[in-house]
């Protein structure tokens, strides 16, 4: 269970009593509480059942004044020096030793809570070109160019790092191995992985496994624009079979569940378009693998193993899930949107693949803009937009506890963590219930009933059952027992264990 988090967002809001706001050191603080005296911070994240914290870029970036970090904000996708921790997150940015030590202390603190640390890496481009260390070392060599000699821009950031060239490839591999070994990292997330070449990443994976056999590797299997790197060489979704040790974000899952991230008002399966997307849901619940009993083309199923799929409905990019629901469901009540949010979360945690969420998603995180709308990409928005509002842990406790319960259910039942396409095809069966509603049968042990519409759904499992999740609660221990048919409320699930 991956929890995506920006270092500064974690502790910058004054709703929690952090001492080292916006710093690596905030992760080392214990007994942090919000304005209602509820536990927040690292202890809280561990209590959710998170297994890995994915940190947005923590290497040295270019656009933040390290001696005056509050003068600006950036996610960190503006690389300067890849192998040095960002100084603005330390108590003394002018002391190189402090950068290293304080980042190591963060990682140690996370490990002490039983979680791993995944580092977001951005090898696909550098913030500047002519002034970058690579251009000064060997002009032209480290960057891709178009046929007319201009810099290519598949990153949409001004340049592309030529990973396929021998010394560029070696730099990436050496950098990853250094970071994994020196900082005891547990994984890497690759920004715009489709701009990196397959050979480099496979070489890196082989060497990284020697350092940490359980290391997690995943990324964005696409580009940000046209690139001269031939498609057959790109580390992208269509080439996933050539990258067996890497998982990739499933934009099919993301957009299928809630609607396109590029069309704010477009609805997905959970918020208004269920009947048209029920076959898509069968596919993504199965981990995106090809199934003859699901109406989806084999060419659209880009992997044959759930271990290559990262399922999510919210990340740092684009609108938060709850903001998307506000825009795409303008006539719905606040409680209806909360129900839809919980339904989307259930699909993330109870589908085959790797579940991923953005920090604060479980407390209905929102990024309102001053003009009354919502910020799509808050990469340079102020702390007032980006910070986690820790009082929401208390205000939205029921939603948070629902997420926590779903995570616990996933951990208890191996049916939600199948490892091969054969197991998925043989153990998951789908039953169409009309209007896009589905029942997912996991052998004769579990039934997951999904009701994405606005009316109550009656379902009879044919046997007595123990209910683990309904519209209000989710838990790894049975909530109650039923005999005969049960009612599944609008925009919700029922998870039943059969007796």
Role assignments for model-derived ranges:
Residues 15-34, 324-335, 378-384:
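A solvent-exposed, charged loop/short amphipathic helix patch at secondary-structure junctions
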Residues 205-206, 210-370, 379-381, 428, ...:
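Conserved alpha/beta catalytic core and glycan-binding cleft of carbohydrate-active enzymes
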Residues 3, 53, 117-119, 188, ...:
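Hydrophobic faces of well-ordered beta-strands that scaffold small-molecule active sites
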Residues 8-183, 197, 201-212, 216:
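Substrate-binding/active-site clefts of carbohydrate-active enzymes
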Residues 42-47, 107, 176-180, 205, ...:
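Non-transmembrane alpha-helical segments in soluble domains
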Residues 1-3, 8, 335-338, 349, ...:
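Carbohydrate-interacting/catalytic domains
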Residues 11-12, 61-65, 124-129, 195-199, ...:
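Flexible loop/turn segments at secondary-structure boundaries
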Residues 187-193:
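Short catalytic-loop micro-motif centered on adjacent basic/acidic residues
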């Amino acid at each position: 269970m991956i929890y995506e988090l920006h270092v500064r967002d974690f502790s910058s809001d004054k709703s929690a009593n952090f001492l080292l706001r916006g710093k690596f050191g905030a992760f080392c603080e214990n007994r942090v509480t919000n304005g209602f005296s509820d536990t927040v911070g690292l202890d809280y994240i561990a209590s959710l059942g998170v297994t890995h914290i994915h940190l947005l870029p923590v290497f040295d970036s270019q656009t933040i004044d390290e001696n005056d970090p509050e003068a600006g904000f950036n996610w960190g996708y503006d690389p300067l020096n890849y192998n040095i921790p960002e100084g603005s997150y330390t108590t003394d940015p002018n002391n190189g030793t402090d950068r290293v030590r304080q980042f190591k202390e963060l990682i140690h603190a996370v490990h002490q809570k039983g979680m791993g640390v995944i580092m977001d890496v951005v090898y696909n481009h550098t913030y500047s070109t002519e002034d970058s260390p690579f251009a000064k070392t060997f002009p032209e060599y480290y960057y891709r160019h178009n046929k007319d000699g201009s810099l290519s821009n598949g990153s949409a950031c001004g340049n592309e790092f030529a990973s396929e060239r021998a010394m560029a490839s070696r730099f990436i591999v050496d950098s990853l191995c250094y970071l994994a070994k020196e900082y005891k990292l547990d994984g890497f997330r690759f920004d715009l992985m489709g701009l990196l070449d397959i050979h480099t990443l496979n070489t890196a994976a082989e060497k990284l496994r020697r350092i940490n056999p359980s290391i997690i590797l995943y990324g964005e299997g696409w580009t940000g624009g046209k690139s001269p790197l031939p498609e057959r060489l790109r580390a992208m979704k269509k080439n996933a079979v050539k990258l067996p040790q890497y998982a990739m974000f499933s934009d099919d899952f993301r957009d299928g569940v809630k609607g396109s991230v590029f069309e704010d008002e477009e609805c997905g399966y959970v918020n208004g378009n269920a009947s048209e997307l029920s076959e898509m849901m069968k596919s993504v619940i199965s981990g995106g693998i090809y199934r003859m009993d699901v109406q989806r083309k084999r060419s659209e199923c880009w992997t044959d193993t759930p271990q290559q799929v990262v399922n999510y409905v919210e990340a740092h990019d684009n609108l938060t899930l709850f903001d998307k629901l506000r825009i795409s469901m303008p006539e719905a009540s606040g409680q209806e949107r909360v129900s839809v949010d919980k339904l989307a979360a259930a699909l993330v945690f109870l589908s085959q693949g790797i579940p991923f969420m953005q920090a604060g998603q479980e407390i209905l995180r929102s990024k309102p803009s001053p003009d009354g709308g919502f910020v799509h990409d808050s990469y340079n928005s102020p702390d007032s937009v980006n910070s986690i509002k820790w009082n929401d842990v208390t205000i939205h406790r029921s939603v948070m506890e629902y997420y926590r319960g779903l995570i616990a259910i996933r951990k208890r039942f191996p049916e939600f963590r199948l490892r091969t396409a054969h197991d998925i095809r043989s153990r998951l069966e789908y039953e169409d219930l009309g209007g896009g509603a589905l029942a997912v049968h996991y052998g004769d042990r579990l039934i997951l009933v999904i009701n994405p519409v606005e009316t109550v759904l009656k379902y009879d499992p044919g046997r007595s059952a123990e209910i683990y999740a309904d519209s209000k609660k989710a838990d790894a221990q049975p909530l109650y027992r039923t005999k005969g048919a049960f009612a599944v409320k609008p925009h919700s699930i029922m998870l039943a264990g059969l007796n």
